[in-house]
């Protein structure tokens, strides 16, 4: 039995295919979803989406949004999403270093909050590449 997973951003469909299982980062922690999961709607945190296709796991970096699960269908609407295979490792590492430097230089509450958010996004992209599946 499978689940239909659809990952959408405001600009494109990132994923629309059947999967065996997912592990989703929510604002209250990670949840695993298998076929016949109870219906829920949840906020999606900045984090990794793990997708199981048969015996293979794939990862995707999600940049926050929400998900609806029910009737073996999962719809994930996020601000942005990238498959790990589409992320350039060198560019992701550079972005992480820039975000870390920006946080060190941040002055004031607003700059610190924005720098922390940029750092979380950058770390998520690096984690998506390095995820052990």
From Swiss-Prot:
Keyword Transport: yes
Main location: plastid
InterPro entries per the UniProt record, alphabetical: ATP_synth_F1_dsu/esu, ATP_synth_F1_dsu/esu_N, ATP_synth_F1_esu_C, ATPsynth_dsu/esu_N
Gene3D superfamilies, alphabetized: 6.10.140.480, F0F1 ATP synthase delta/epsilon subunit, N-terminal
Signal sequence range: none
Described function: Produces ATP from ADP in the presence of a proton gradient across the membrane.
Entry protein name: ATP synthase epsilon chain, chloroplastic
Organism whose genome encodes this protein: Helianthus annuus
Taxonomic lineage from the root: Eukaryota, Viridiplantae, Streptophyta, Embryophyta, Tracheophyta
């Amino acid at each position: 039995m499978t689940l239909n997973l659809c990952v959408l951003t405001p600009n494109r469909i990132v994923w629309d295919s059947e999967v065996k299982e997912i592990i989703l980062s929510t604002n209250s922690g990670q949840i695993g979803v298998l076929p016949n999961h109870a219906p829920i709607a949840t906020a999606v945190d900045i984090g990794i989406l793990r997708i199981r296709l048969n015996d293979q796991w794939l990862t995707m970096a999600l940049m926050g949004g929400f998900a609806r699960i029910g009737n073996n269908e999962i719809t994930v609407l996020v601000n942005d999403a990238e498959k790990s295979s589409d992320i350039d490792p060198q560019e992701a590492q550079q972005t992480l270093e820039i975000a870390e430097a920006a946080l060190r230089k941040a002055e004031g509450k607003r700059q610190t909050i924005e720098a922390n958010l940029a750092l979380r996004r950058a770390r998520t992209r690096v984690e998506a590449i390095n995820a052990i599946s």
